[in-house]
């Protein structure tokens, strides 16, 4: 039995690993505080929480497979009660997420019933180079299966995704693993199938409650696994008073006056991701306008 100190050392961490005798690479990530911070300022239904957790883990794993500086957005849009689910992450493993709900979502509602007619859009935006956008139909029962299909189609590489969300010791947690055959063509389908069969035996409590090294040993104790140093994962919104003021300046003077009149002389701009409030009165707005000029 692993004690609390042992497993928490790998909370909010992402690891990459390679199999020494098989041309397959892997990644493992667990979101603890990162996931909690995402949910803290919203009252999302349980099914939406789980979906966001899946999307966050997948985004972390996707950013780790792509060696570039930039960010990735994974977004679902639909006409069901879940109008939008969006996750944005970057190469520093800073991640944020939000959802917009318009209607009743029950705890065990299926992905298709939540979204209705919708699509999954993945946007890859490197700091240098062209932006890439892929649109994926939501024709699988779970978002993990849809994303796994995306990995296979976009990279033309055999890929396995295992993502779980839930609670561990009374706190929300999301975790996942990715296995992918090496792109140099040296891997065999037999090696990949062998390793994915072992990975599929992983239990929720192992993903949620073991440090990475022990988890990999339990799954692959007959393999030689090279585990690389961890990368920290954290919730990072990126909002600021400056960004809010820039958005405010896009509104016409007439609209600003109307909003000020309706809200007792103060405009409250709340960040949709983290819930931070930015307040602007008429004096502050006039000052912003003068500095812009």
From Swiss-Prot:
Coiled coil: none annotated. GO terms for biological process: protein refolding. SUPFAM superfamilies: Hsp33 domain, HSP33 redox switch-like. Keywords: Chaperone, Cytoplasm, Disulfide bond, Redox-active center, Zinc. Signal peptide: none annotated. It is found in: Cytoplasm. It comes from the Bacteria. GO terms for molecular function: protein folding chaperone; unfolded protein binding. Disulfide bonds join 237-239, 271-274. Under oxidizing conditions two disulfide bonds are formed involving the reactive cysteines. Under reducing conditions zinc is bound to the reactive cysteines and the protein is inactive. One of its GO terms (cellular component) is cytoplasm. Its main location: cytoplasm. Redox regulated molecular chaperone. Protects both thermally unfolding and oxidatively damaged proteins from irreversible aggregation. Plays an important role in the bacterial defense system toward oxidative stress. Belongs to the HSP33 family. This is 33 kDa chaperonin.
């Amino acid at each position: 039995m692993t004690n609390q100190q042992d497993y928490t050392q790998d909370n909010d961490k992402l690891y990459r690993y390679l199999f020494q005798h098989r041309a397959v690479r892997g990644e493992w990530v667990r979101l603890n505080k990162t996931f909690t911070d995402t949910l803290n300022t919203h009252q999302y239904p349980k099914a939406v929480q789980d979906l966001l957790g899946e999307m966050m883990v997948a985004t972390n794993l996707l950013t780790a497979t792509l060696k570039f500086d930039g960010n990735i957005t994974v977004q679902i849009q639909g006409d069901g009660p879940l109008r939008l689910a969006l996750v944005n992450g970057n190469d520093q493993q800073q991640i944020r997420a939000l959802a917009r709900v318009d209607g009743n979502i029950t705890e065990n509602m299926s992905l298709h019933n939540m979204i209705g007619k919708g699509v999954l859009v993945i946007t890859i935006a490197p700091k240098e180079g062209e932006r890439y956008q892929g649109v994926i139909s939501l024709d699988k029962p779970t978002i993990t299966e849809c994303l796994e299909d995306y990995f296979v189609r976009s990279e033309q590489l055999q890929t396995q995704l295992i993502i779980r969300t839930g609670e561990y010791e009374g706190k929300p947690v999301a975790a996942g693993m990715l296995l992918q055959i090496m792109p140099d063509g040296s891997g065999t389908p037999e090696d990949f199938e062998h390793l994915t069969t072992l990975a599929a035996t992983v239990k929720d409590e192992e993903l949620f409650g073991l440090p990475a090294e022990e988890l990999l040993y339990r799954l692959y104790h007959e393999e030689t696994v090279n585990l690389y140093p961890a990368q920290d994962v954290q919730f990072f919104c990126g909002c600021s008073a400056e960004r809010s003021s820039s958005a405010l300046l896009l509104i016409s003077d007439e609209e600003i006056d109307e909003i000020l009149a309706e809200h007792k002389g103060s405009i409250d701009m709340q960040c949709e991701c983290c819930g931070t409030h930015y307040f602007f009165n008429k004096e502050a707005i006039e000052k912003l306008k003068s500095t812009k000029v």
